[in-house]
Amino acid sequence: EVEVITPNISRWGSTAIFGDKKSSCAVRGLQPDYEKIEAQNITMGRFINDVDILENRKVCTIGKRVYDELFPQGGNPCGQYLRVDGIYYQIVGVSLSTSNMNINAGTEDSVTLPFTTMQKAYNFGKRIDLVCITVKPGVTVTSIADKIEQVIKKAHYIHPDDKQAVIM
């Protein structure tokens, strides 16, 4: 019934720095399959991949507003390093698209890290802010919402009657 399920973690109020340029941003930790939830429209470089996840690579993609503020002269920044919250990340991709979703930060305002890298860099442990799900054709989310909620609660030892832990 479920086609894609992928976690999302984020942090607001960060600053990305490249040389003497700064950009306020959100930092998102995503899995490669997030692209199946929301197309990233990478125009330079690439998106986060499985090797980045497995090796906890310090790489990132940057959104349109972050790119415009850090690289006002334009050009391809892939291979360059920017600093966010005291940690250097190599830019591997740029998304010049605007986001359809603005939950936990839109693409254009974000520096996106591999999910596992963000977990370690910010000491998030097993924290997940958002779980994004798509369902197979012909299935509605409302038809399986209760089942999804039960699975999440069971997997994370949340009491079945707790109405605040999981919001659908």
Region locations from a protein language model:
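Juxtamembrane "pre-transmembrane" interface segments
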Residues: 160-168
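Conserved beta-strand segments of alpha/beta enzyme cores
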Residues: 3-4, 41, 167
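Residues that act as N-cap/strand-start positions at coil-to-secondary-structure junctions
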Residues: 10, 21, 75-76
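Short active-site oxyanion
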Residues: 23-25, 166
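Membrane-proximal extracellular/periplasmic loop immediately following the first transmembrane helix
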Residues: 1-12
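Mid-to-C-terminal secondary-structure elements
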Residues: 16, 26-28, 32-48, 52, ...
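Acidic pyrophosphate-coordinating catalytic loop
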Residues: 14-20
